[in-house]
């Protein structure tokens, strides 16, 4: 459960990300594909090379979904319901991949915003991403 401080930290972090969400999302995906090559199996139709237009487009989708979630912290299940259905029933993404992408996103954010990426912000973002992953996998059962 996100505390009031966590919610404040998450909102502040996403405000700081601003117009860089797509860029950071793509970078996190690239980092995931390089660090965890098995994740590429979910994107057989993608060019997963550095700078790929498909990776950039999907990175923007990921960032936009997370920005939407960050603006609906008190109602994540409803805010993410359609994405949960998509990932559980159509795409059938292994839930562990959400954790891998979350880790890569945290690394990306830490690289771009080291001064703002305090231990408290790191913990809040980690809890937020874990909560998002839990919601996205809630319809797998």
From Swiss-Prot:
The modification N6-acetyllysine is found at residue 16. CDD domains: Hb-alpha-like. InterPro entries: Globin (IPR000971), Globin-like_sf (IPR009050), Globin/Proto (IPR012292), Hemoglobin_a-typ (IPR002338), Hemoglobin_oxygen_transport (IPR050056), Hemoglobin_pi (IPR002339). Disulfide bonds: none annotated. Heterotetramer of two alpha chains and two beta chains. The modification Phosphothreonine is found at residues 8, 108, 134, 137. The modification N6-succinyllysine is found at residues 7, 11, 16, 40. It holds the Pfam family Globin. This is Hemoglobin subunit alpha. One of its GO terms (molecular function) is oxygen binding. It comes from Ctenodactylus gundi (Northern gundi). One of its GO terms (cellular component) is blood microparticle. Heme b binds at residue 87. It comes from the Eukaryota. The modification Phosphotyrosine is found at residue 24. Red blood cells. O2 binds at residue 58. Keywords: Acetylation, Heme, Iron, Metal-binding, Oxygen transport, Phosphoprotein, Transport. GO terms for biological process: hydrogen peroxide catabolic process. The keyword NADP does not apply.
């Amino acid at each position: 459960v996100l505390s009031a401080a966590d919610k404040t930290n998450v909102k502040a972090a996403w405000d700081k990300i601003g117009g860089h969400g797509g860029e950071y999302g793509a970078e996190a995906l690239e980092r995931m594909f390089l660090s965890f090559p098995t994740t590429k199996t979910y994107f057989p139709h993608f060019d997963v090379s550095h700078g790929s237009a498909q990776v950039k487009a999907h990175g923007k989708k990921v960032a936009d979904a997370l920005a939407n979630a960050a603006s609906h912290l008190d109602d994540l299940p409803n805010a993410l319901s359609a994405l949960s259905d998509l990932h559980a029933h159509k795409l059938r993404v292994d839930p562990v991949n959400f954790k891998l992408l979350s880790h890569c996103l945290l690394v990306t954010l830490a690289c771009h915003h080291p001064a703002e990426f305090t231990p408290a912000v790191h913990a809040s973002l980690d809890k937020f991403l874990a909560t998002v992953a839990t919601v996205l996998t809630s319809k797998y059962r």
